[in-house]
């Protein structure tokens, strides 16, 4: 009984709860024994955690979830890869907010970048607190937005993206700690055919932007895995499948 000496009551949905309580000499509560309120057992969840992910409490989801950020310069296949994975496997994807709000990259205003950063931050915070799927795909992130900010407004303090005038109000150190980070970063290199849909920088500018992005990630202590393969989807898909296999193994082995 050494490991149970501080336990006063045992709670569960099966009859063995009573037997354990009698043996230990403590109180017990048996609830929903006929599974009228919760029509699923822990054994079912353990047997297929992907299918029954929604039944896990947020704290457990946060332990098992894996956040994958796909970053890189323009026209490198980030959105295409994320959308294909979302459609194929049903994992939640956080979209590239800038593409939703900006007509052309080089015409992006400071106010729009501030809005993009804020929306991205709120979305990432939400999926961090209660992950809706075991794999969360990020089509870029807040660091990419910060990189655009520093690239377009070269002499403006980075903290202005949060609405502060200078570092006397909010420091870059505070900004560093505020940024939400993924578990894995893939950086798509600018070595595939460039497609300009009318909203992007020129190909030469996109390559300069790529270097700026990598410097931004380095500033935040992140060294993304560089992807140069032409079939980028396959690279990320294999990584996702390996992570899911590891998750299932880990979940099943826990008592």
For each of these PLM feature ranges, what is it?
Residues 83-128:
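Conserved substrate/cofactor phosphate-moiety recognition/catalytic segment
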Residues 74:
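The conserved Walker
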Residues 153-232, 248:
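A glycine- and Lys/Arg-enriched "phosphate-lid" helix/loop adjacent to the NTP-binding pocket
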């Amino acid at each position: 009984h050494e490991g149970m000496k501080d336990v006063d009551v045992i709670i569960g949905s099966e009859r063995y709860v009573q037997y354990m309580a009698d043996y230990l000499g403590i109180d017990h509560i048996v609830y929903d024994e006929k599974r009228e309120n919760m029509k699923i057992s822990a054994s079912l969840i353990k047997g297929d955690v992907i299918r029954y992910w929604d039944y896990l409490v947020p704290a457990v989801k946060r332990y098992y979830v894996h956040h994958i950020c796909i970053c890189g310069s323009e026209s490198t296949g980030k959105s295409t890869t994320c959308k294909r994975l979302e459609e194929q496997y049903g994992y939640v994807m956080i979209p590239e907010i800038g593409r939703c709000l900006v007509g052309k990259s080089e015409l992006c205003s400071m106010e729009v970048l501030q809005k993009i950063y804020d929306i991205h931050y709120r979305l990432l915070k939400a999926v961090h607190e209660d992950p809706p799927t075991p794999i969360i795909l990020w089509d870029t992130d807040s660091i990419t937005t910060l990189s655009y900010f520093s690239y377009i407004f070269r002499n403006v303090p980075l903290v202005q993206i949060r609405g502060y005038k200078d570092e006397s109000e909010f420091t870059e150190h505070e900004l560093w700690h505020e940024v939400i980070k993924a578990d894995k970063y893939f950086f798509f290199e600018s070595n595939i055919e460039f497609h300009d849909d009318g909203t992007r920088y020129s190909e030469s500018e996109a390559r300069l932007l790529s270097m700026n992005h990598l410097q931004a990630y380095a500033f935040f202590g992140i060294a993304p895995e560089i992807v140069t393969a032409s079939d980028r989807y396959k690279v990320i898909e294999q990584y996702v499948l390996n992570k899911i296999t590891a998750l299932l193994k880990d979940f099943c082995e826990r008592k």
